[in-house]
Amino acid sequence: MDKKSFYGLGRRKSSTAKVYLYQSKDKGKITINHRNPSDYFPNKLVIQDMEQPLELTKLKDNFDINVVVKGGGFTGQAGAIRLGIVRALIKFNPDLKKLLKTKKLTTRDKRAKERKKFGLYGARRAPQFTKR
């Protein structure tokens, strides 16, 4: 049986996710680093955020999804997986891009941690000011 696969790369904060979609006849199974999403992520909201493009396009049961994700925390990893799924779905069917773009799922969230500056305690926290 020749399985057709689609690849998408997603990034968010310091996380990178390689997403592989495999067409399947049975219920869509998702594995993240060889684990179930419920075992990998601590709460359901992160999983719902990650599965949003599949729910929107109603293609959740059509694909088995294999994800390799590295770096960052859980929300960053979920955002990276979501973007990877979106990019792979667009490779599967370019007509889905219009639907996904209306929900702003195709754009990468470029927000990242601001760097620490010298003379300060953090990115913006300054030493306490003394008037006299």
From Swiss-Prot:
InterPro entries in UniProt: Ribosomal_Su5_D2-typ_SF, Ribosomal_uS9, Ribosomal_uS9_bac/plastid, Ribosomal_uS9_CS, Ribsml_uS5_D2-typ_fold_subgr
GO molecular function: RNA binding; structural constituent of ribosome
Keywords tagged on the record: Ribonucleoprotein, Ribosomal protein
Superkingdom to which the source organism belongs: Bacteria
GO biological process assignments: translation
Pfam families: Ribosomal_S9
Membrane-spanning intervals of the chain: none
Gene Ontology terms: cellular component: cytosolic small ribosomal subunit
PANTHER family assigned: RIBOSOMAL PROTEIN S9, SMALL RIBOSOMAL SUBUNIT PROTEIN US9M
Family, as annotated: Belongs to the universal ribosomal protein uS9 family.
Protein name in UniProt: Small ribosomal subunit protein uS9
